[in-house]
Amino acid sequence: MTSGEPKTSLKNACPSARRLLPKAEEEEEADYCAPGAFELERLFWKGSPQYTHVNEVWPKLYIGDEATALDRYGLQKAGFTHVLNAAHGRWNVDTGPEYYRDMAIEYHGVEADDLPTFDLSVFFYPAAAFIHAALGSDHNKILVHCVMGRSRSATLVLAYLMIHRNMTLVDAIQQVAKNRCVLPNRGFLKQLRELDKQLVQQRRQAQSSDDSEKASEKEL
């Protein structure tokens, strides 16, 4: 299932997260605040019931499960060039660069447990950088997977959309959930919420700085 870039909207979010959609594009996030865990889970519940082995959630970006990652022939036939394993390790999905050594596939492993107490946030930026680099070429196609393709892999894809596609957490959830049934655990949602706060604050500060520079230029 192919999906294009989403229209930024918070119409289905909680009132505290609803954007007022002002005229100036640079003011879009002025009234945004990160929803709580329950409100975020409701966004997932409103998403697509579709849950197959693998689904495209953003152009050339797919979330899948262990079966997809282990199917070397299927990956090659589908044209995947990159694999991000969010369940790397002996006791999870034990693949790695050697597993794909005779294939034109670049591998990145994240050794993570699907537990609310596990700190997945330390992998947000490295994983997002790997995904972003993979999508830098129109010829590339990346699979992000864990065991079920619902929690760890979805969390890293959401972080990527927030970091490199300038989406809020709500926007990112809506984009992914309309294409695949996913649901990160409560701990991961809390970590994504913290990332959301940081990114929104950074954008507000950058916008404030730009506004100050423009005001100074007008005075000259």
From Swiss-Prot:
Compositional bias per record (Basic and acidic residues), positions renumbered to this chain: 211-220
Single GO MF descriptor: protein serine/threonine phosphatase activity
All residue ranges annotated as the Tyrosine-protein phosphatase domain in the record: 53-201
Gene3D superfamilies linked to this entry: Protein tyrosine phosphatase superfamily
Region of interest (Disordered), residue spans: 200-220
InterPro entries found in the cross-reference section: Atypical_DUSP_subfamA, Dual-sp_phosphatase_cat-dom, Prot-tyrosine_phosphatase-like, Tyr_Pase_AS, Tyr_Pase_dom, TYR_PHOSPHATASE_DUAL_dom
Classification via SUPFAM superfamilies: (Phosphotyrosine protein) phosphatases II (SSF52799)
Keywords on record: Cytoplasm, Hydrolase, Nucleus, Protein phosphatase
Enzyme Commission number(s) from the entry: 3.1.3.16, 3.1.3.48
Keyword Nucleus listed: yes
Protein's GO biological process: muscle cell differentiation; negative regulation of ERK1 and ERK2 cascade; protein dephosphorylation
Keyword Iron tagged: no
GO cellular component, one term: nucleus
Subunit-level organization: Homodimer. Interacts with PRKAA2.
PANTHER family, sorted: AGAP008228-PA, DUAL SPECIFICITY PHOSPHATASE 29
Family: Belongs to the protein-tyrosine phosphatase family. Non-receptor class dual specificity subfamily.
Role according to the record: Dual specificity phosphatase able to dephosphorylate phosphotyrosine, phosphoserine and phosphothreonine residues within the same substrate, with a preference for phosphotyrosine as a substrate. Involved in the modulation of AMPK and MAPK1/2 signaling pathways.
Protein name per the record: Dual specificity phosphatase 29
Species of the source: Equus caballus (Horse)
GN (gene name): DUSP29
